[in-house]
Amino acid sequence: MAFHMATRYAHSPEDIKHFDTTKLRQEFLMEKIFNAGDILLTYTYNDRMIFGGVVPTESSLEIKLSKELGVDFFLQRRELGVINIGGPGSIIVDGDKAAMVKQDGYYIGMGTKQVVFASDNPANPAKFYVVSTPAHKTYPNKKLPFANALAKPMGDQQHLNKRTIYKYIDASQMATCQLQMGYTVLEPGSSWNTMPAHTHARRMETYMYFDFAEPDTRVLHLLGEPTETRHIALFNEQAVVNPSWSIHCGVGTTNYAFIWAMCGENQTYDDMDQVPMNELR
């Protein structure tokens, strides 16, 4: 088992005006999220979110972070959200085991001492996408089946953005310290997500793109200030960090899905500032 946690630092809007393609990708793109038998994480200084992939195969896996976070165990002062995008597996949370099929989620509160990830079949391993944010209070652990996710249809075919937003961890459904998490699925024939664009200065957000309709599907993710945008070309199962001052939207060559996760000082999902189309540059 390999464990690796990369670090991404925070940037001001002025910084990326001078980034070339290579530098932009180095600072905001996570090219490898899932690798069989490994735990691959990224720590971003944007609201101190940790995110990444856990892919157990023959053996179960456990995230063990202590010195890196100045704590005795990983979730001593953090909460954790999980969504499985792979084969069937399970999570053991302080001794309580829960089956996790594809699209199932889980919320794990501060103070949980042990979280163990396992796959039912090593040849078709579970792929657990995990997101952790700082916490100040313990909220109950809760399995989040896909069937219970709050579905919100958005967009239309005329604007190439017909999609459904599935809210797993959302303040309207459950209490957390700051974590919000869910995923969005675009319908065939649609390619745009989160367009018209918006910003939310009180929260940062990560996008992890996956379930591309075709092997050669690519997504161009847009970020930056509305009047100073940049793009990053993404492959399947890659993630991008969006600072709170940045737009975050994308367009694909076919349809796709992405997991979004947010944290910051405001949990109101609709607390956002819409960007008029004529202001985009």
Curated annotation (Swiss-Prot):
Record-annotated disulphide pairs: none
SUPFAM superfamilies attached to this UniProt entry: RmlC-like cupins
Reactions mediated catalytically: 5-dehydro-4-deoxy-D-glucuronate = 3-deoxy-D-glycero-2,5-hexodiulosonate
EC number per UniProt: 5.3.1.17
Residues annotated as binding Zn(2+): H198, H200, E205, H248
Database matches in Gene3D superfamilies: Jelly Rolls, pectin degrading enzyme 5-keto 4- deoxyuronate isomerase, domain 1
InterPro entries for the chain: KduI (IPR007045), KduI/IolB_isomerase (IPR021120), KduI_N (IPR027449), RmlC-like_jellyroll (IPR014710), RmlC_Cupin_sf (IPR011051)
Keywords: Isomerase, Metal-binding, Zinc
Metabolic or biological pathway: Glycan metabolism; pectin degradation; 2-dehydro-3-deoxy-D-gluconate from pectin: step 4/5
Entry's Gene Ontology molecular function annotations: 4-deoxy-L-threo-5-hexosulose-uronate ketol-isomerase activity; zinc ion binding
Keyword Metal-binding attached: yes
Cofactor: Zn(2+)
Transmembrane domains' residue ranges: none
GO BP term, pick one: D-galacturonate catabolic process
Cofactor detail note: Binds 1 zinc ion per subunit.
Record NCBIfam families: PRK00924.1 (NF002091)
Recorded family membership: Belongs to the KduI family.
Function in brief: Catalyzes the isomerization of 5-dehydro-4-deoxy-D-glucuronate to 3-deoxy-D-glycero-2,5-hexodiulosonate.
Protein name: 4-deoxy-L-threo-5-hexosulose-uronate ketol-isomerase
